[in-house]
């Protein structure tokens, strides 16, 4: 039998698919352990710094949820890739970039201040939509990381609970 030499892109696709199956199997096993349905788990493919072509390879494996760390990359990808992709902004978000994210990201995972929540709320109201957000919590208390201390979360949620648009 002849040795088959794979083109680099073909090999990458095989590895991506293999890794995806491994991750999906790990999700199923973890869910079985804790009595949870795997359908309740959302697998988000983190696309930071990856080219659009690679995202399309994962997209072709029926993955529709993508997470991006950088605003400009998310904007470029969201505006040029298929519209059924669900985008998650998972990186630190600065208030001056909120206008680019609200309306493109289906979920903002990194709300770490009242001022950022206000900016998201105001932009969502302007665009007549609701922006889904998650609160970033710095559970390890690392100085170089963003997020609320665990004991600050409840107060933050109370402060923003009446904000429209989020």
Residue ranges and their predicted role:
Residues 12-166:
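Conserved alpha/beta-domain cores
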């Amino acid at each position: 039998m002849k040795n088959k030499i794979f083109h680099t892109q073909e090999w990458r696709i095989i590895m991506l698919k293999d890794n995806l199956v491994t991750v999906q199997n790990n999700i199923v096993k973890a869910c079985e352990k804790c009595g949870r349905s795997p359908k309740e788990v959302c697998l988000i493919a983190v696309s930071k710094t990856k080219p659009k072509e690679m995202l399309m390879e994962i997209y072709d494996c029926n993955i529709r949820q993508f997470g991006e760390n950088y605003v400009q990359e998310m904007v470029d990808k969201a505006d040029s890739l298929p519209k059924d992709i669900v985008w998650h902004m998972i990186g630190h978000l600065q208030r001056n970039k909120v206008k680019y994210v609200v309306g493109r990201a289906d979920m903002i995972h990194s709300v770490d201040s009242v001022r950022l929540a206000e900016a998201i709320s105001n932009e969502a109201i302007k665009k007549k939509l609701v922006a889904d957000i998650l609160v970033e919590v710095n559970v390890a208390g690392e100085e170089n990381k963003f997020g609320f201390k665990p004991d600050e979360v409840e107060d933050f949620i109370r402060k923003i609970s009446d904000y429209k648009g989020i």
